Design a protein with these regions (language model features):
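Internal low-complexity, small-residue/proline-rich segments
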Residues: 1-203
Length: 203
C-alpha cells in the first residue's frame, strides 16, 4: 500500500486524501491503478458517490490486496489497512488528512518517521476484542492516562457505557467497507503518537 501511495503521488503531484476522493471514495480506491487493479478503478463511476447504485458492481468485490490473511474477520469488503489522517488529539494533522493537499517533499521531518497507512484488526457486529474496537481522541482528553493497553480499553468501555459502540454496530464498524473514505472504516488517527509512552494520551 505504501508503494502505491508513492506511485499516486508521483503521478498526481500530491498524496491521496482521506475521504477527499470523488464521491467520498477511499484512499484504497485512488491507489487501485498502482496495485495492478487499473480495470477495477476504471469501472468505478467517479462522478457520483461511491455508494451510488451505479458503483455497486465495482465496489462489491473482494480485494485480497487489502486483506491480512491471518485475520479471520478480514475479507469481503473489510480492509485490514487504513490511511492515517491525524495524530494525538486532532484528526487532520496526518499526511492523508482531508483538509489539505501534501507532497512528499512537504514532509520535512523525514518519511522514515511518518506513517501514511497502517495495518489494523477489522471489527465486526458484536465484536468486543479491545484490539478491534474504535477509539476516538475525545475518549482520552480527561482523567488519568491509562497505564496499559488493557487499561486503555477499560477506560474506553467506562466512557461509552458499553465496550462495543461502533464495534457492535451492525452497519458501521472498523474496516467496514474498503471503498468508503471515512474515519474508523478506511482511515484512522494515532491517539498515541510516535515515541510517546504507551500510557500517555497527551500530545
Amino acid at each position: 500500500m505504501g508503494s502505491a501511495i508513492h506511485g499516486d503521488e508521483a503521478a498526481f503531484g500530491s498524496l491521496p486524501q482521506g475521504g477527499g476522493g470523488p464521491g467520498g471514495s477511499s484512499i484504497q480506491v485512488r491507489i487501485l491503478p498502482y496495485l495492478e487493479l487499473g480495470p477495477l478503478y476504471n469501472s468505478i463511476n467517479h462522478g457520483v458517490s461511491i455508494l451510488d447504485k451505479s458503483n455497486v458492481t465495482s465496489t462489491d468485490v473482494t480485494n485480497s490486496v487489502f486483506h491480512c490473511p491471518p485475520d479471520p474477520l478480514a475479507g469481503s469488503h473489510n480492509p485490514s489497512y487504513a490511511g492515517c489522517v491525524g495524530s494525538g488529539d486532532y484528526r487532520n494533522l496526518g499526511v492523508l488528512g482531508g483538509e489539505k493537499t501534501l507532497r512528499l517533499a512537504d514532509i520535512r521531518d523525514g518519511l522514515a518517521a511518518t506513517v501514511a497507512a497502517s495495518e489494523y484488526l477489522v471489527g465486526g457486529a458484536g465484536v468486543v476484542d479491545r484490539l478491534r474496537l474504535v477509539y476516538t481522541p475525545d475518549d482520552f482528553t480527561t482523567g488519568p492516562a491509562p497505564a496499559s493497553a488493557d487499561a486503555f480499553a477499560a477506560r474506553r468501555g467506562d466512557l461509552v457505557g458499553e465496550v462495543p459502540e461502533l464495534g457492535g454496530d451492525t452497519q458501521y464498524y472498523k474496516g467496514f467497507y474498503w471503498a468508503l473514505g471515512v474515519e474508523n472504516i478506511t482511515l484512522y488517527n494515532h491517539i498515541i503518537t510516535h515515541n510517546k509512552p504507551k500510557g500517555d494520551r497527551h500530545t
